[in-house]
């Protein structure tokens, strides 16, 4: 395994012995606690050859797509001395150097990243992400902490989202192939999604779509949790199997609509379809008065 590592913040006031035994994750040394935690500084790091980002701390990440690699950190001396950044097997890892993070300043740690492409973002900490991702093939988002994708546009062929924490996606997405979502936490999609292909959603948590998911193709949804969202489907199939609470509006221009309701299902369906089938085994309220079934 090839590893390139930068030991950040080797200030004159911090001896090399303060950074020993990194793998054992000892508590923050007093030397680090005594560093300046008011003046904000910025450091450039010689890190390159990565296509993925993995975060395990509380941080803001600003990403710019560029032909050249660059990584820099911005924060107080005290915060930077506790951050550890390294590239391992193509992944830029952002983590704590010590067992705990000591910070008496309100200024958040920031990382500025430039790279030709990013196809994976993994978060186990508290991450605010800013930046456009123009990826021709795929993008995989994995979250087990608190993740806000605050600003930017995603353009990709295939997108997968696996969430076991709190995930807010505030930016639009343009997907040319397919979208797969597995949610076991809290997931909010607060902007439009356009998918020119298929959508597969498996929800076991809380899932909200505040605007609309536009699909040219097919959608398959299994819901065991709480789901609230709107779809616009032009294509083949829309199928939902609900075992939890499912509240949705569907604007359809498709071949087939199938609803299996084993929980609480509340839907308004408008537009046109060639066929609709409803299997009512729960508490079901589906309004199809504005739906035209074509002969």
Q: Predicted segments — roles?
A:
Residues 1-295:
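Intrinsically disordered, low-complexity terminal regions
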């Amino acid at each position: 395994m090839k590893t390139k590592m930068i030991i950040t913040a080797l200030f004159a006031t911090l001896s090399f012995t303060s950074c020993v035994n990194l793998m054992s994750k000892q508590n923050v040394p007093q030397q680090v606690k005594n560093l300046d935690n008011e003046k904000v500084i910025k450091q450039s790091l010689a890190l390159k050859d990565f296509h993925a980002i993995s975060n395990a701390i509380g941080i803001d990440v600003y990403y710019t797509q560029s032909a050249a690699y660059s990584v820099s950190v911005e924060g107080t001396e005290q915060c930077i001395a506790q951050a550890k950044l390294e590239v391992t097997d193509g992944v830029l890892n952002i983590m704590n150097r010590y067992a705990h993070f000591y910070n008496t300043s309100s200024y958040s740690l920031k990382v500025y990243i430039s790279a030709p492409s990013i196809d994976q973002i993994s978060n186990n900490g508290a991450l605010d992400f800013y930046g456009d991702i123009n990826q021709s093939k795929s993008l995989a988002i994995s979250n087990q902490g608190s993740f806000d994708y605050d600003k930017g546009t995603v353009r990709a062929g295939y997108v997968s989202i696996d969430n076991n924490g709190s995930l807010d996606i505030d930016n639009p997405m343009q997907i040319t192939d397919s979208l797969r979502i597995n949610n076991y936490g809290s997931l909010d999609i607060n902007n439009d999604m356009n998918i020119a292909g298929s959508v597969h959603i498996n929800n076991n948590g809380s899932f909200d779509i505040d605007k609309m998911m536009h699909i040219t193709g097919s959608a398959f949804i299994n819901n065991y949790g709480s789901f609230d969202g709107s779809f616009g489907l032009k294509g083949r199939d829309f199928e939902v199997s609900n075992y939890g609470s499912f509240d949705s509006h569907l604007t359809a221009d498709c071949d087939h609509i199938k609803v299996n309701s084993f929980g609480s299902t509340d839907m308004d369906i408008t537009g046109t379809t060639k066929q609709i089938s409803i299997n009512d085994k729960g508490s079901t309220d589906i309004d199809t008065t504005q739906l035209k079934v074509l002969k």
